[in-house]
Each structure stands twice: as C-alpha cells, then as structure tokens.
Amino acid sequence: MNREIYDFVAIGIGPFNLSLASLSAPLRGVRTLFLDKKSGFDWHPGMLIETSTLQNPFLADLVSLADPRSEYSYLNYCKLTNRIYSYYMRENHYLSRAEYTRYCQWVAARLPNLRFGCDVQGVLHDPESHSYLVTGQHTMSGQRFMFRCRKLVLGLGSQPYLPACCDRRAAPFIHSADYLRHKYELQGRASITIVGSGQSAAEVFHDLLRESGRHDYSLAWITRSPRFFQMENTKLTLELISPDYTEYFHDLPEARRQEILTQQNSLYKGINASLINQIYDLLDEKVHDGDNRYTLLTNSELRACRYDPLQERFQLDFQHLDCDRPFSHATDGLVLATGYSHEIPACINPIHDRIAWNADGSYRIGRNYAIDHEGSEIFVQNTGLLSHGVTNPDLGFCCYRNSQILRELTGTEHYRIETRTALQEFSPPADGVLKHRPARRAERGPTVAARPLMDIHRATL
C-alpha cells in the first residue's frame, strides 16, 4: 500500500482531467494523482476520421486560457515538434481530431502525475483520517493498488447512447464511437444507413460519401431533427459559453433550465457549417453525374429495430413527426450516431451516502462542481449540463472550470479566474431599473487623419 496521502486523486483521464493534470503539475506542494484504466491517452479513437476537425480553435487547448505561458500549450507542442511555422503558414485555427489527440498524447507523455493501466474498482471513506481510499487493480500485472487522498475528482467521461429500441445483443449495429473499427466491413455492405443528426453523424456520412465512388453501397442519412442544422458560432451567441452565462444559468429554477437546454441544441449538437457545405457540394456533384444512390430525410424518429441474421439485414420502423405517418426502411449496415450519456460509476457505490443526489438519481452539482454534501471534497467533470448549461461539454471552457476546481481543491487561486468576460448582460437589474451607462466625454484634440487598414497577418517591417 502506498503510504503517501495525495491532496486529490482524479479518476479518468480524458481531455478535461488531462487539462486539470497539466494545470496542477507545476504547483509546488500540491500532490496529485490521475488514474485511468486505458493503457494510454486515447480520445474517441473510432471517430478519428481523416477530415474531421474540432469545433474549437487551438486556443481551447489544455492550458492556454488559464496559463498561456504553460509548457503544455498547443503552441509549445508545435514549437518542440518543429511544426510551428507550418502551422502558421496553414492559417487554420481549427485542429483535426487526430492532431488534437496527438497533442494530448504528447502532453500525457510528459506529465509525472498520470498512471494509465489502473482500473479503479472502489472508493472508500476513512472517517478517522478524513481521507478517501482509492482501490483497484493494475490491468497488466493484476496487482492490487490502494491510494489515499483528501479529495476526489471524477472525470470518467460518457458512454455511447443507444435508442431504447436498439439491443446490441440482438443486432450487430455500430455506434459512431466505433465507426473506424468497423468501416472496412461496413463498406462491403450493399446499403448503409446513418441515424442521427449531429457532428458525428455528419462526419460519418461525409466520409462514406467521399469514398462511395470506390464502392457500390447505397447511403441513407435519417434523423429525428427537423433539419440538418449547423452549430451556432456567431460571437454574441458564443457568449452563452462564458463564465457570466454559466453563473446566470446555474441560478435559474431547474424547470426553466431544462426548457432553455432544449432551445440551445444548436450550440453544442449542431454541425460545423463548413462540413454541411462540403456535404452539399459533394452530393450535388454526384447527383449531376447521375449517381442517385443517396437519401437524406429529417423529422423521422426511429421506433423499432429488428435484425434478420439469415439475410443479414436490419428492418427499421420510423414515424415521420410532421406527417404523423409510419414508414419502414431496410438496410444492410446501420450506424447509430445517437450521442452519449453519462453513467454513475460503480466504483463510488461505497461512498454513495457522502454524495448529494437529485430525485432522478443524478448528481446534485454545486456551482463549484462539487457533489458531496459538504461541497468541498468530491468534484466532477463534464456531467453538469442541467446545472451549468452548454459550457459543460465545451473544450474551450475546461481551463476556466479547472481553475475553479483547483481553487476549491487547494484553497488557493493558482490561476486567475475572470469574474466577467461577456459584453452583454443576462440578468435584469437588481433594483428593477435598467439605466443607460454614462457616455465618456470625448477629449478635444487635433483631428488625426484615418490610417489605411493593414492586413496585420501579412505585415512586414
């Protein structure tokens, strides 16, 4: 047994906890440990499609929005891997998923506080020492381990969500999370159907559409959504992914928060506008060349899924929501791009009574991301959509959240936590009167001729 007492142990090493590890590693006197069952960092390997990109610019890396000088920044990664000038020449601020994964793996290899291959199987509380015991097994050797810590961070991520009518034990369908692993087999089918309408569905459809010229499959894309809508990324709308809005959202009644989230799907469930346009242009080109084997249909909800093992075909039943009319659809290959859901990890069952729960069995998450009754010992990553809104799954917000969590874990604000970042207001005035802000009196002085605008990026001395 390791006798050292860590200030906190984090379970799970995805991007959010990897960010926390990167921000905590340089802190003197802060003892941390991050555990994960996987053999190394691997983020959505089934969706590392060649053309897929992140929805956030490179500044939304693991550390820059908290500490731009960090050695674990994406720009430092580019510098140390001799890629910074080529990245500058590309003039593209959006990373591919594969590039982001390589960057995260580069960071993970340099952090001293990560332990992969550690399957956490239980968390116990020791009331005498006011500490937690994290127990489990090394996946390679089978040897047991036990670590003692004062506080916990849970960052176990999400699991592929399947519609209620789909039973993986009865049918060999594929969730988009496993797409690349089954892609070759899938392309040998006579017909392929994708169900879903978000970014993952669009990336899978686009990938199969691009390569359809080398194969004979027909391709269908069916979604319950009323349209293939793009992700909103205008600047004032993006301020809904800000500390200011998170504070406002968290203070609203729960019923109102639920209503708002249904209105904000396009903020985190939409498709990149560039990808939508690429799909349209490619479809248009193929159709005009006489290739008509593609079907796109909206407003259609999957109600039943049956698989015939003899014919190796799926029989799908849909309900068209606008027309209120059922229809059936047969396909040889099925990809469910139906998103992800969060599950309560079994390892925390022994400390169930120390955690605050909602009536529906979900965590009751405090404003500081704590879920224990004291609000100071157990923290969570990426499970607070209803409590904290659309900032919850956003990569660009993880540095701000982790700066807050680190402050709660250590009692010190190691990284500056901005109190206001938005240019707009979200709450009405406390006194019930909205007043104009006073104008700043213009200073009198000589008139200066306007200077011509320059392309700063290409400016030379």
Curated annotation (Swiss-Prot):
Keywords: FAD, Flavoprotein, NADP, Oxidoreductase. It is an enzyme of class 1 (oxidoreductase). Its cofactor is FAD. GO terms for biological process: biosynthetic process. FAD binds at residues 9-15. Pathway: Siderophore biosynthesis; alcaligin biosynthesis. InterPro entries: FAD/NAD-bd_sf, Lys/Orn_oxygenase. It holds the Pfam family Lys_Orn_oxgnase. One of its GO terms (molecular function) is oxidoreductase activity. Gene3D superfamilies: FAD/NAD(P)-binding domain (3.50.50.60). Its EC number is 1.-.-.-. Belongs to the lysine N(6)-hydroxylase/L-ornithine N(5)-oxygenase family. This is Alcaligin biosynthesis enzyme. The gene is alcA.
